[in-house]
Each structure stands twice: as structure tokens, then as C-alpha cells.
């Protein structure tokens, strides 16, 4: 997961992928979730939602919160 997170970090710094940043945050959130870092997962899902309210991160964030509660 660390390699995936590093690659996503690099892509997020690339301005040429501006239109896909919400998906990159969603994917990075998934990577953090699989790693067990729930705070980073939730933060990344929220970043994705802020960029695109229709992002699949909405459902992922809701499910993560349900699991944690």
C-alpha cells in the first residue's frame, strides 16, 4: 500500500490531472483504509467529496464511519 500511496501522492501534485483529482483522493483513501489508517482514509474521502459531491467517496466515507461507530 505504501507504494500505491506514494504514486498517488505524485499524481496529486501533477497539475495535468486536475480533472481527476477527486478520483485520486478516493483511491488514496482506499489505500489508507486497507492499510488501517482510518483518519487518513476519511480525510482523503472528504477531499474527494469536496471536489466532486457525486464521487464514490461519499459511499466509502459513509461505510467507513459506520464501521468505526
Language-model regions: role of each:
Residues 14-17, 50-51:
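Structural marker of alpha-solenoid helical repeat scaffolds
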Amino acid at each position: 500500500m505504501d507504494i500505491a500511496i506514494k504514486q498517488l501522492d505524485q499524481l496529486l501534485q501533477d497539475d495535468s490531472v486536475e480533472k481527476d483529482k477527486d478520483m485520486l483522493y478516493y483511491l488514496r483513501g482506499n489505500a489508507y483504509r486497507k492499510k488501517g489508517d482510518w483518519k487518513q482514509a476519511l480525510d482523503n474521502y472528504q477531499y474527494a467529496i469536496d471536489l466532486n459531491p457525486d464521487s464514490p467517496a461519499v459511499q466509502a466515507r459513509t461505510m467507513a464511519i459506520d464501521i468505526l461507530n
